[in-house]
């Protein structure tokens, strides 16, 4: 059984802060801007938008794909769920370090 999205998100925030010391992780309000990804990660001069899903097959809400693609074209944007979490965080780590 898949974990609740908010449980996954809380654990993810802790892991991001461990992997990226000093990172600021902001929870975004989709009520303010429909489809904006759940999390903004700020670390040094880098940033990422991450949309948390409880599982890989979870439905994408309106505009989520647009904002993930836009963020990725500017910096880093991904859908993240328990099955791909390690791959995405590793990719984010590589992406941030490459741009130093």
Report the location of each language-model feature.
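Catalytic phosphate/metal-binding cores of nucleic-acid and nucleotide-processing enzymes, i.e., regions
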Residues: 1-100
């Amino acid at each position: 059984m898949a974990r609740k999205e908010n449980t996954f998100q809380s654990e993810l925030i802790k892991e991001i802060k461990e992997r990226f010391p000093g990172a600021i992780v902001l929870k975004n309000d989709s009520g303010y801007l429909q489809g904006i990804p759940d999390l903004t990660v700020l670390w040094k001069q880098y940033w990422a938008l991450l949309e948390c899903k409880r599982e890989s097959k979870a439905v994408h809400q309106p505009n989520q794909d647009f904002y993930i693609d836009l963020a990725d074209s500017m910096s880093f944007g991904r859908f993240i769920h328990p099955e791909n979490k390690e791959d995405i965080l590793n990719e984010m780590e590589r992406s941030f370090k490459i741009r130093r």
